[in-house]
Regions:
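Domain-level signal for soluble alpha/beta catalytic cores
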Residues: 1-257
Length: 257
């Protein structure tokens, strides 16, 4: 779209190839698993794209064009049939709170409201910083605020349960570290130059403790959890899989007890 001078992608072209492929293979995957597939889709948000393409100076038409484009990708990612259901669409804004577009909060909220103007799935925004979260509480169409907690424990200090209740929002908290470069550096300082898969992943007890702390704070407002984001850079699928498995086991153990 940008090659033609527009930041708004044609609706028929706004399809994530991964989602398309999963949709095509949904019947086979569902029958192999013995259950309906619950899909979570993550998409870089309009603010992140704007920072990469334009910078910090706001241009309303460009912001609205990018918001419309991401909305179309999100809408087309909502699948629902007997084999698959898109349970969550998460818009990822990792720079928000660190490197912001110099626009008034009402403009930013308007951009995000346009982005989240779709139905059929829980609508999340994923942030790496809690700075500026107050501005997002008024965003319509947004169901869940998602934060890094495992690698950035101070994030939950900035978000109270009463804030979420007042805005009728839910929260997702990351409870297992995924910042692999820092993990490797810490292990190296301890004399572990070539860590095993098991050494890369935090102990189940550590993950469970984080879950308990977050759940105690947010109660029924904490409707989602899992690892922090960023498994793409992990050294192997085996290590990433172990992290996911250990996180699930930690949560189930905490809920059981």
């Amino acid at each position: 779209a940008m090659e033609t001078g527009s930041f708004l992608v044609n609706e028929k072209s706004a399809v994530l190839p991964e989602v398309y492929l999963i949709g095509q293979e949904a019947k086979t995957l569902s029958e192999g698993l013995g259950r309906k597939i619950q899909l979570r889709v993550s998409i870089f948000g309009p603010l992140e794209h704007y920072l990469h393409e334009i910078g910090n100076t706001p241009y309303q038409d460009v912001l609205e064009g990018l918001a419309g484009t991401i909305q179309r990708f999100a809408k087309n990612s909502v699948l629902n049939n007997k084999y698959i259901e898109t349970a969550v669409v998460s818009i990822d804004e990792p720079s928000f709170g660190f490197n912001n577009i110099q626009a008034p909060s009402d403009v930013i909220c308007g951009v995000l409201e346009k982005t989240f103007d779709f139905k059929g799935a829980v609508r999340q925004i994923h942030l790496h910083s809690a700075a500026g979260v107050h501005d997002l509480l008024s965003v319509k169409n947004l169901d869940v605020l998602s934060f890094e907690y495992a690698a950035s424990p101070k994030n939950i200090d900035a978000v109270s349960k009463s804030m979420l209740e007042g805005a009728d929002k839910q929260i997702r908290v990351g409870i297992a570290r995924t910042d692999i470069d820092s993990i490797l550096a810490e292990l190296y300082e301890k004399g572990v130059g070539k860590p095993s898969v098991d050494q890369l992943v935090e102990p189940k007890e550590t993950i469970e403790k984080r879950y308990r702390v977050a759940k105690q704070k947010y109660g029924d407002r904490m409707t989602f959890t899992g690892p922090d984001c960023g498994l793409g850079g992990w050294p192997s699928q085996e290590s990433a899989q172990l992290l996911l498995e250990r996180t699930v086991k930690a949560v189930k153990l905490a809920q059981k007890n």
